[in-house]
């Protein structure tokens, strides 16, 4: 019973939405696109994502229908291995953008921005 109380105590140390949490907001939530045309998604963090080591740990992930998420971009603008160069990332501090220069049919899916500067 004592162990259970200790575990519960540890779980209660992190309260989502508390002042130290970083909240990520993406816009638009959905967007119709035209094949061959550019598209972009914006992501804003509630506080700077610059880590104490000087890096900014902002990543973009793509989840195609029926598949797990895959990493597209890491540390703002670095394309992961095998990611086409039509994908690019930019931004700094709290504001970031994922751009697709020419949308292709295989780009359909859900896109996520993710920070790894701060963990609960």
Swiss-Prot record:
Q: List the disulfide bonds.
A: 43-113
* Complementarity-determining-2: annotated segments: 75-81
Chain intervals for the UniProt region annotation (Complementarity-determining-3): 114-120
Q: Which PROSITE patterns match?
A: IG_LIKE
Q: Which InterPro entries has this protein been placed in?
A: Ig-like_dom (IPR007110), Ig-like_dom_sf (IPR036179), Ig-like_fold (IPR013783), Ig_V-set (IPR013106), IgV_Light_Chain (IPR050150)
Q: Could you name the domain of life of the organism this protein comes from? A: Eukaryota
Keywords on record: Adaptive immunity, Cell membrane, Disulfide bond, Immunity, Immunoglobulin, Immunoglobulin domain, Membrane, Secreted, Signal
Q: Where in the cell is it found?
A: Secreted; Cell membrane
Keyword Kinase in record: no
* Renumbered residue ranges of the record's region Framework-2: 60-74
Write one Pfam family the protein is assigned to: V-set
Region listing for Complementarity-determining-1, in residue ranges: 44-59
User: From which residue to which does any coiled coil extend?
Assistant: none
Region (Framework-1), start-end ranges:
21-43
Q: Give the record's GO CC terms.
A: extracellular region; immunoglobulin complex; plasma membrane
Specify the signal sequence span.
1-19
One GO BP annotation is: adaptive immune response
Assembly notes:
Immunoglobulins are composed of two identical heavy chains and two identical light chains; disulfide-linked.
Q: What does this protein do?
A: V region of the variable domain of immunoglobulin light chains that participates in the antigen recognition. Immunoglobulins, also known as antibodies, are membrane-bound or secreted glycoproteins produced by B lymphocytes. In the recognition phase of humoral immunity, the membrane-bound immunoglobulins serve as receptors which, upon binding of a specific antigen, trigger the clonal expansion and differentiation of B lymphocytes into immunoglobulins-secreting plasma cells.
Query: What name does the UniProt record give this protein?
Result: Immunoglobulin kappa variable 2-24
């Amino acid at each position: 019973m004592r162990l259970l109380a200790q575990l519960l105590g540890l779980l209660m140390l992190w309260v989502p939405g508390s002042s130290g949490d970083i909240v990520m907001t993406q816009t638009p939530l959905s967007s119709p696109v035209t094949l061959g045309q550019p598209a972009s998604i914006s992501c804003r963090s509630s506080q700077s994502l610059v880590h104490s080591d000087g890096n900014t740990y902002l990543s973009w992930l793509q989840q195609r229908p029926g598949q797990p998420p895959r990493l597209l971009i890491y540390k703002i603008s670095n394309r992961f291995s095998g990611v086409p160069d039509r994908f690019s990332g930019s931004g700094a501090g709290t504001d970031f953008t994922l751009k697709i220069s020419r949308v292709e049919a295989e780009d359909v899916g859900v896109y996520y921005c993710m920070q790894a500067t701060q963990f609960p």
